[in-house]
Amino acid sequence: MDSSVKLPYYATDVPLPLPTEAEIENALNISPEYEGKGVNLVEEENMLFVQEMTKVPVPRVYALYSNPQIGKNYIVMEHIARETLAKLWASLTGAEKESIVAKLHSYNTTRSYTSCHHQVTMSIDKQTLLDEIFWTQHTEAMINSSFITEAALNKAMVWKYTHDSRPHYKADFYCQCLPHIFCGHKLMFTHGDCQHKNIMIQSDPQWMTANNRTLEIVILDWEKSGWYSSYWEYCLAVCALCWDDDWGLWIEKMLDLFISEVSWLQILRLELWS
């Protein structure tokens, strides 16, 4: 499957007739983040790619299309009626946490297969990188486009630093240091926001015993996903930690560690997105 999705997209396995635009507009239970003219189809394009190319569980996407006359995008997808892992985490047993983390680790390994021949850091639609660190008010090719090499990605972060009118001497310092830290990494299709609030959990009643239960997971929030250097997933997962529970202590069991890289990327993120 090509990484880009041809739009409009309509799935062939829709369980019920698709709602009309009028029904969507009048629906009462649509999440605020999926309302209005700001709806971005790239998150669902990412999910379609993951659904097709990996074993990572994501909500089923049934339709992606636009109405240019009113300037709106429409997404029809599976509703996941489950609790977030963040809400349930404190109540889980050690064995249940181990089971969930083992599944997440296996999904991380699966994602690496999708990138073995991929050579460009980019978003799924080959357009602007959507991680906040690359945000600019208007598209800037030097900062948030696709990048052929890891060195070019490093330069993009330095360009973002100077773009925001920060001291050029420190930008020069980053130019000296980053090539020694962010180098030699392979590319991997990256979720980009690996937090337990973005993982939905449901117990499977068919596999429950007196002392154990099987927990099925579905991963949400693929908006910022794309092909990034292999350190990106771990570093962003650590950067997002609030340390209000022990979730951060389990990350090393699900993602490859990049200890040196996370220290530098956290500094950059604080400066470039604050």
Where are these regions (language model features)?
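ATP-binding pocket architecture of kinase catalytic cores
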Residues: 2-141
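Short, low-complexity Ser/Thr-rich regulatory SLiMs
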Residues: 65-68, 201-205
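An alpha-helical support segment within catalytic cores of ATP-dependent transferases
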Residues: 97, 113-192, 202-214
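Acidic active-site catalytic centers that drive phospho-/nucleotidyl reactions
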Residues: 43, 191-193, 198, 221
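The start of beta-strands in P-loop NTPase/AAA+ ATPase cores
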Residues: 55, 73, 186-188, 216
